[in-house]
Amino acid sequence: MSQGFKTEADVMRNTAHRVDDTNQEVSAELSRLRSIVDGVRASWEGTAQVSFDNLMQRWDASAKGLQDALQSISDNIRGNATSFENVEADNQSAFSAVGGQGLAL
């Protein structure tokens, strides 16, 4: 028998924080690589340099896309944690409203 899906809001927020950390690490590494690559730009001339510049524009767009995707994942996880807490609070209120009267069946 399946145990189902279980989670807690604090676990979700911790996961979102880990995604943020990963995003920062990826950003730092991409910046480091970009600095290295920028150092060889001067070795290209003419149409080769134009091609190189076009390639680097695509690199920048892809890097931003990756960073945006990681940020979106983190934001979604945080939003889900808040929704999870709200549903839990609503459920608790609903059960408390029944109180000692039991269910009218």
Curated annotation (Swiss-Prot):
Superkingdom of the organism of origin: Bacteria
Gene name in the database record: esxB
Name of one Pfam family that matches: WXG100
Xref: InterPro entries: ESAT-6-like_sf, T7SS_ESAT-6-like
First and last residue of the signal peptide: none
Species this protein is from: Corynebacterium diphtheriae (strain ATCC 700971 / NCTC 13129 / Biotype gravis)
SUPFAM superfamilies found in the cross-reference section: EsxAB dimer-like
Region of interest called Disordered, as start-end residue ranges on this chain: 1-23
Other remarks in the entry: To improve expression in E.coli the proteins were cloned as a single protein in the order esxB-esxA with a cleavable thrombin tag.
Subunit description: Forms a tight 1:1 complex with EsxB.
Similarity-based family: Belongs to the WXG100 family. CFP-10 subfamily.
Biased composition (Basic and acidic residues): 7-21
Protein name as it appears in the record: ESAT-6-like protein EsxB
